[in-house]
């Protein structure tokens, strides 16, 4: 939990999920403060759009202006809602939209936290291009090290004249004025053929490894089990290639695709529709924080390629939460399979949670682990 006085409100903010007290990560950064310093409340005219507000620092500060919080992270939405409540601000003050929604017309102010993925930034700038005017104040912010020449060129190409500020507390801002430059249309998804399958994989802008199959998933797919039945889960599904493979290998199983990214879940849905349409009725698609709210003892197996970062921050909190949720939602003798970088040492984490862990396969970079839910039903 951390405190920030940004000139608009004095706020107490926390990350979501919360980090441990030993190595706490802040729920805001200098770029948030720097962005807010540029605004005079008396000059805000028209809708306020906030893009990629990780834990709600900007949304909480500008809540009295009824901002729209736009992004591709359900965790960020949950974190923002939690921080609104914690600071005594009505959740209804902020309208949440995912990045593929239609943005409000003629915004007065647009504040952008530059995302980690350049493809997501381009998708968002193209969406803004349809609604901003020459009078819209457009300001983006990030750590100085995360603003590159390619970032500035993208703003110039999609929106118009772009300048940068001096660095402040290692943060830098981008100021942009809309001039409606000529711009060719771009496809909504990036598509590629998955070797040895005949499948075409569709990827929205913010999907992990959208340009091709990542090597961890490739290794995982070589060791997926067959002859499963009942409900199984592709947890943190991304574009859904693991779940798609499970559908093909296990015709008696139903697959639940789960991710906190709306773009990921929509990519998974599209990939089942186009590649295994006959299996679509065996699928469920869920935007969720891991398996929050899912009933216990529901699933026969969970498959997971857990992230070890949240936006720009390295953390195993999300993976830890996924493992705990998986154990709660597995049936007795249900199995959790994960693929992970060897250096992360998830073997001992799983053994601590499940009381057991076995190595299924390993290479010089990755390991595939299996843990089984044991014990009596509680």
Curated annotation (Swiss-Prot):
Pfam families to which the protein is assigned, alphabetical: MTS
Subcellular location: Cytoplasm
Keywords: Cytoplasm, Methyltransferase, rRNA processing, S-adenosyl-L-methionine, Transferase
Gene Ontology terms: cellular component: cytoplasm
Top enzyme category: transferase
Entries under InterPro entries matching the protein: DNA_methylase_N6_adenine_CS (IPR002052), rRNA_m2G-MeTrfase_RlmG (IPR017237), RsmC/RlmG (IPR046977), SAM-dependent_MTases_sf (IPR029063), Small_mtfrase_dom (IPR007848)
Reactions accelerated catalytically: guanosine(1835) in 23S rRNA + S-adenosyl-L-methionine = N(2)-methylguanosine(1835) in 23S rRNA + S-adenosyl-L-homocysteine + H(+)
UniProt-listed SUPFAM superfamilies: S-adenosyl-L-methionine-dependent methyltransferases
Major localization class: cytoplasm
EC number per UniProt: 2.1.1.174
A GO molecular function held by the record: nucleic acid binding
CDD domains: AdoMet_MTases
Family, as annotated: Belongs to the methyltransferase superfamily. RlmG family.
NCBIfam families per UniProt: PRK15001.1
Function, in words: Specifically methylates the guanine in position 1835 (m2G1835) of 23S rRNA.
Protein's recorded name: Ribosomal RNA large subunit methyltransferase G
Source species: Salmonella heidelberg (strain SL476)
Designated gene of the protein: rlmG
């Amino acid at each position: 939990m951390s405190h920030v006085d940004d000139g608009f409100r004095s706020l107490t903010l926390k990350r979501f999920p919360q980090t441990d007290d030993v190595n706490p990560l802040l729920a805001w950064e200098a770029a948030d403060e720097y962005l807010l310093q540029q605004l005079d409340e008396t000059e805000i005219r028209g809708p306020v759009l906030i893009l990629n507000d990780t834990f709600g620092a900007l949304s909480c500060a500008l809540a009295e202006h009824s901002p729209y919080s736009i992004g591709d992270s359900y965790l960020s939405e949950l974190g923002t809602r939690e921080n609104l409540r914690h600071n005594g601000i009505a959740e209804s003050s902020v309208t949440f939209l995912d990045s593929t929604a239609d943005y409000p017309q003629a915004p007065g102010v647009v504040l952008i936290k530059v995302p980690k993925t350049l493809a997501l930034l381009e998708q968002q700038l193209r969406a803004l291009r349809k609604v901003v005017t020459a009078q819209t104040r457009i300001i983006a912010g990030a750590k100085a090290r995360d603003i590159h020449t390619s970032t500035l060129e993208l703003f110039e190409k999609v929106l118009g004249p772009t300048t940068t500020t001096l660095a402040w507390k290692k943060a830098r801002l981008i100021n942009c004025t809309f001039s409606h430059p000529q711009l060719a249309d771009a496809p909504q998804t990036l598509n590629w053929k998955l070797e040895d399958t005949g499948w075409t994989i569709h990827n929205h802008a913010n999907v992990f490894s959208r340009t091709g199959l990542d090597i961890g998933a490739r290794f995982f797919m070589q060791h997926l089990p067959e002859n499963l039945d009942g409900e199984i889960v592709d947890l943190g599904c991304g574009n859904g290639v693991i779940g798609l493979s499970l559908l093909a290998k296990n015709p008696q199983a139903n697959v639940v695709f789960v991710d906190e990214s709306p773009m990921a879940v929509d990519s998974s849905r599209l990939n089942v529709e186009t590649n295994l349409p006959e299996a679509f009725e065996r699928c469920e698609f869920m935007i969720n924080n891991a398996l929050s709210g899912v009933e216990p003892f529901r699933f026969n197996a969970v498959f997971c390629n857990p992230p070890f970062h949240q936006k720009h921050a390295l953390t195993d909190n999300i993976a830890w939460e996924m493992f705990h949720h998986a154990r709660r939602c597995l049936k007795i003798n249900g199995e959790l399979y994960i693929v992970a970088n060897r250096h992360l040492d998830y073997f001992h984490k799983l053994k601590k949670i499940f009381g057991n862990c076995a190595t299924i396969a390993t290479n010089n970079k990755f390991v595939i682990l299996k843990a089984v839910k044991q014990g009596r039903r509680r």
